[in-house]
């Protein structure tokens, strides 16, 4: 049997040309940074440098930061991405030229009607949504909403007390994931779901399906390797957001809106109601009101963007408190002083706790959940001698910036005092960006901080946290787009009504 097929010369030529064209297609953009004189890891055909994500994007960025400095280039498949860690250039990208050039984030696959969400929308549509939604996230509105959020803090304590009475270490992500889910669904959809004790509730199940996003999923990988497939997937009505879940929430929004419009009960002040309030006659005339579909998109994106980030951040802060008893004691003292005899938590008292704020900020520095900020350059531009071509994706790597010893002495140490009144003013806002920066920063920043602070105070008001045999001494992080522990954080919790024994 012949190993080489007996083909005509013409066939061999066509085959060779085809292979060359395929190779060119898979590599044609891979010379972008070499031409610009920008260093970076060597790309592979089609894959670019994404195989470097095997330990997580945060680790890839940290490695590149140490090797190449404050500017480097890499490739997500065939897409060139310019990493910028220079504070002055970051300021220009995120703030100074946000409206004129760096307005939009990267399009990432087919998203269906979710393109109407504030996170994914572009240009004038984004500006319109930001204008409509920003009033819902002011301090005043959050204070009005606090009684709703506060009840989930009570549920959190009840769930923890039930676990504590079992006398076993607690999986903190399980408990705090339920808290985060309840807060977001309660404020975005106006429903009370005790998700820890009702895991089979269809609302909880549909929400959790939205959260299953894996960079190495074959569907996602196909989009990275062959971007043209996005157009085909759009025509086929495929989406990175599961249709079963998005359809469920669309129907739910319509039903909930009808119920509220025809209800004689006092209006519940939550994000859902605030979105409904844009649909007044004046808003309709000016075409500024949110449509029902846009309301659904915002509510879904709140789950997608808020659940994992908030619950993981709280877990990591509590982990640091358990491993730093001196910090925990100091925070216990502040809580006991501000809320004597376990007084109910109020918005004003919560926001006035200085040491709590320091602890939360330091936790977000060590563990920036959104470890990348991205913008697209709409036109060719030069910033501080750096030429940025039109259409290039610009990425700010927050993880290595948050741990750079140039800005943070002994960066691996958990030191809330970095964010004291005396020190906070000296922190460059472009090397500390847990919620991004500029006009397109995280719109839910105040809400996320409020949720985190309420959870931490609710826990520490009632419990002391300790490490146990199952607690990892050095956390390992998963191969995910966002920063999250590979294994659950397990802690021992002790009621403060009981005497504390050794760990």
UniProtKB/Swiss-Prot annotation:
Heme binds at residue 442. PROSITE patterns: CYTOCHROME_P450. Pfam families: p450. Induction: P450 can be induced to high levels in liver and other tissues by various foreign compounds, including drugs, pesticides, and carcinogens. GO terms for cellular component: endoplasmic reticulum membrane. Keywords: Endoplasmic reticulum, Heme, Iron, Membrane, Metal-binding, Microsome, Monooxygenase, Oxidoreductase. Its cofactor is heme. Its EC number is 1.14.14.138. It catalyses: lithocholate + reduced [NADPH--hemoprotein reductase] + O2 = 6beta-hydroxylithocholate + oxidized [NADPH--hemoprotein reductase] + H2O + H(+). It is found in: Endoplasmic reticulum membrane; Microsome membrane. GO terms for biological process: oxidative demethylation; steroid metabolic process. InterPro entries: Cyt_P450 (IPR001128), Cyt_P450_CS (IPR017972), Cyt_P450_E_CYP3A (IPR008072), Cyt_P450_E_grp-II (IPR002402), Cyt_P450_sf (IPR036396), Cytochrome_P450_3A (IPR050705). It is a peripheral membrane protein. It is an enzyme of class 1 (oxidoreductase). GO terms for molecular function: heme binding; iron ion binding; lithocholate 6beta-hydroxylase activity; oxidoreductase activity, acting on paired donors, with incorporation or reduction of molecular oxygen, reduced flavin or flavoprotein as one donor, and incorporation of one atom of oxygen; testosterone 6-beta-hydroxylase activity. SUPFAM superfamilies: Cytochrome P450. Catalyzes the 6 beta-hydroxylation of lithocholic acid and steroid hormones. Belongs to the cytochrome P450 family. This is Lithocholate 6-beta-hydroxylase. It comes from Mesocricetus auratus (Golden hamster).
